[in-house]
UniProtKB/Swiss-Prot annotation:
The keyword Ribonucleoprotein does not apply. Keywords: Chromosome, Differentiation, DNA-binding, Nucleosome core, Nucleus, Spermatogenesis. Testis-specific. GO terms for cellular component: nucleosome; nucleus; pericentric heterochromatin. Belongs to the histone H2A family. It is found in: Nucleus; Chromosome. One of its GO terms (biological process) is chromosome organization. This is Histone H2A-like 1. The nucleosome is a histone octamer containing two molecules each of H2A, H2B, H3 and H4 assembled in one H3-H4 heterotetramer and two H2A-H2B heterodimers. May be incorporated into a proportion of nucleosomes, replacing one or more H2A molecules. Interacts with H2BC1/TH2B; preferentially dimerizes with H2BC1/TH2B to form nucleosomes. Disulfide bonds: none annotated. Atypical histone H2A which can replace conventional H2A in some nucleosomes and may play a role during spermatogenesis. Nucleosomes wrap and compact DNA into chromatin, limiting DNA accessibility to the cellular machineries which require DNA as a template. Histones thereby play a central role in transcription regulation, DNA repair, DNA replication and chromosomal stability. DNA accessibility is regulated via a complex set of post-translational modifications of histones, also called histone code, and nucleosome remodeling. The lineage of its organism: Eukaryota, Metazoa, Chordata, Craniata, Vertebrata. It comes from the Eukaryota.
């Protein structure tokens, strides 16, 4: 009697699980805020990767600022200092008028 070969089916994995990126958050934000229904998954993947890259770099630099001032936590002022002192980040955030609120603690 021949043994029947059983195929093991892989469980479906979401884009977030495969890429370890928060696609669903970016997708929902873009669709709600900009009413965009023409977003491809590759566009979401690219945008999410760019946002993650920028965030990690800013937080790394802000962590160094906090550490040099003898603190263990990153404060909003550390993020603001990083953006102000880095020419590329300053240019990136300049057109949109994005700023860090100094009153947040």
């Amino acid at each position: 009697m021949a043994k029947k070969m059983q195929r093991r089916r892989r469980q479906k994995r979401t884009r977030s699980q495969r890429g370890e990126l928060p696609f669903s958050l970016v997708d929902r934000f873009l669709r709600e805020e900009f009413h965009s229904s023409r977003l491809s998954s590759s566009a979401l993947s690219f945008l999410t990767s760019v946002l993650e890259y920028l965030t990690s770099n800013i937080l790394e630099l802000a962590g160094e600022v906090a550490q040099t001032t003898g603190r263990k936590r990153i404060a909003p002022e550390d993020v603001r200092l990083v953006v102000q002192n880095n020419e590329q980040l300053r240019q990136l955030f300049k057109p949109g008028g994005t700023s860090v609120n100094e009153d947040d603690n």
